[in-house]
Amino acid sequence: MLPVQCRMARIALEWGVRELADAADVSTNTVTRFEKGDELKQRTVDAMRTAMEARGVVFVEAGDTADGYGVTIKA
């Protein structure tokens, strides 16, 4: 998950930083740092990704579509 995908997914879920932090059991500072491009431990990124995937987010990786990377929500 790229930082921009994290922000896109969070916005798609209509979550603030606090909601993602709570769902992933990380601090709000951690979410903010990641979205600004700071490198985090992979398990921390995985926790945020898993929390959003549990709410229906699908992460689209570069190469999966002609449009590049992004996010979508399962209907």
For the regions a language model picked out, list residue spans one by one:
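Hydrophobic micro-packing sites on short alpha-helices
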Residues: 10, 20, 48-52
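Helix-turn-helix/homeodomain-like alpha-helical modules used for DNA recognition
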Residues: 57-75
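A short, glycine- and basic residue-enriched loop/turn
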Residues: 17-18, 37-41, 63
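Recognition helix of helix-turn-helix/homeodomain-like DNA-binding domains
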Residues: 25-40
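Short alpha-helical DNA-recognition segment
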Residues: 15-29
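Short basic helix-loop element that most often maps to the first helix and adjoining turn
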Residues: 4-19
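DNA major-groove recognition helix of helix-turn-helix/homeodomain DNA-binding modules
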Residues: 42-60
